[in-house]
Amino acid sequence: MEGFLDLYLELNVPSPVEEATWHRWFEVWLRELGVTDPCELSLCLTSDEHIRQLNREFRHIDAPTDVLAFAAEETSTPVELQKITGVRLLGDIVISVPTACAQAKAQGQRLSRELAWLASHGLLHLLGWDHPDELSLQRMLQQQHHLLAAIQEDLEVTHGQQP
């Protein structure tokens, strides 16, 4: 099952997480979520200015945010995992590294962990998860904790950054 993910990484700002690590994390998470068919997604690490433009254009909110997800398949519930022919296009995740850095600092955690948290959140959105109410949000956050636990050993490695 190795190599079932095509990950397109766009770095508009430096990343403390190496490309191979991002790839490994997404493959682990997809397996944890039961996705085994070949798929592709893109991850863009960017500035507050860029994510603000996207947020304004697509959500009509003129402010930066931490993460945006643009799913290739629109669904109101988590995607039913079914066998498909060919490669499944999941969509795009965009993360503001400056916002992630500020959030990591405020929470006293490493930037790599905050980036993983935001990326896992974006991935869940690509697969149809949403949080329109408190119960849905709690379920989604619980799933994110599960996904981060699956890569805990990687998160304990520094990835070239200060604690």
Swiss-Prot record:
This is Endoribonuclease YbeY. One of its GO terms (biological process) is rRNA processing. InterPro entries: MetalPrtase_cat_dom_sf_prd (IPR023091), YbeY (IPR002036), YbeY_CS (IPR020549). Pfam families: YbeY (PF02130). PROSITE patterns: UPF0054 (PS01306). The lineage of its organism: Bacteria, Bacillati, Cyanobacteriota, Cyanophyceae, Synechococcales. Its cofactor is Zn(2+). Zn(2+) binds at residues 121, 125, 131. Binds 1 zinc ion. Keywords: Cytoplasm, Endonuclease, Hydrolase, Metal-binding, Nuclease, Ribosome biogenesis, rRNA processing, Zinc. Disulfide bonds: none annotated.
